[in-house]
Amino acid sequence: MLARIQECILYRGFSDGEILNNMAELINLYESDEEALKAKEDQFFKSINGLVELAGMYGFSGNIWHTYLTFLLVNHENAFSMASEIRGAIKGSINDLAKNDFQIFKELYDFDITVFDRVFGTVCCKVICDYQTPDENSKLFNTRIRDRICQMSKTLAAAATTEEFMDDMVSFYKDFGVGKLGLHKAFRIGHDENGKVEIQPITRIAHVKIDDLVGYEIAKKKLIENTEAFVQGRKANNCLLFGDAGTGKSSSIKGILNQYYDQGLRIIEAYKHQFQDLNEVIAQIKNRNYRFIIYMDDLSFEEFEIEYKYLKAVIEGGLEKKPDNVLIYATSNRRNLVRERATDKLEIADDNDLHSSDTVQEKLSLVYRFGVRIYFGKPDKKQFQEIVRTLAARYGVTMPEEELLLKANQWEISHGGLTGRAAQQFIDYIVGTEEEKRK
């Protein structure tokens, strides 16, 4: 068997393809010239090292050669994989091209790499065919993604025919997506080495659930209703969560991401200085089979800042229709996002502004772009104590309730007042001190 990776048509130019190229060369030499293969000892051990490093980075175990091949396939964005993501099984000549590539990859799966152990006098390949990672906590993937790839690796290795192999890949693309947008929940905006805008995965996401937020039932219901409409393809609005600091606005956004990820929801985090990149970001995601929320945390503008004008333009859209799969969610401590002066409320013209009322309306027009506006206010004393009691029960705090509430009242005075954040910080402190006492 020859490793014919140079004959692949769709699956080419892998970003992590160095190991593939090196191993393919070794396989071809094994089939044709074993003496020449022995001279490639350094290349062999370098490839094994690469597989082990990859396994450590992503938390892979089992046959990490197969897992590496699977990792390449599930991440490769091409005409076939992206069409399969949207429609599943597709028709047309592209299937013949994809089948050609999958036949080549199936041959790589079927090749017994333990033959290299005899050639190089080692047991490396036997080890990597049943590799046990020393640390299951992946640096770059969460366990859900890691397990999904490892299971897919076993499925592809068990495929009896190229057709079955191809069907398995199509099912994966349809069910879970392809590439970084398919495998990850959240992203940030960055730039590559050439300065081009790119969407970068955020690999560590807090596993917050919307129900973890105690209270705010009306606010949560409104947020859930809008988000559900969006992920289900119905009409939905841009959403602004505003109110006091520490009341759960950001946690609510994280909660809906975790709740609706499996239904195709993705979030891209953006900051004010990145607003100029938003049109390019939207161009990259508008034709993908996901629902994207562009998320702006703690959004507000001072008088001298003009970025809000760029954001208005992005939300409103120009000649091109705004994609149906993109919404903007923001959190802010300010009701109207832009700082307002007392004179803005008066019919008094600024010395340098002939049309002051127009200026005020321009400032306020940004907030009107958010069709859903949800208020998160500070809890009162009774509500704060209820939050403390609920969190204490959730975390197994054993302190008597009277003592617990007394300490909580003392805590909030010096930690930002009556807020859900202060309650959570207090419970974290109590849990930590109780654990220390038990040692």
Which ranges hold each PLM region?
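Intrinsically disordered, low-complexity N-terminal extensions of AAA+/P-loop NTPases
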Residues: 1-157
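Interdomain "pre-motor" coupling segment immediately N-terminal to P-loop NTPase/helicase cores
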Residues: 133-199
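N-terminal pre-Walker A segment at the start of P-loop NTPase domains
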Residues: 202-228
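Walker A/P-loop
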Residues: 238-270, 280-287
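Conserved nucleotide-sensing/catalytic segment adjacent to the nucleotide-binding pocket
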Residues: 265-268, 279-323
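Conserved catalytic/switch belt of AAA+ P-loop NTPases
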Residues: 302-354, 358
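Conserved AAA+ ATPase "SRH/arginine-finger" region at the nucleotide-binding site
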Residues: 349-364, 371-385
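C-terminal alpha-helical "lid" subdomain
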Residues: 373, 377-439
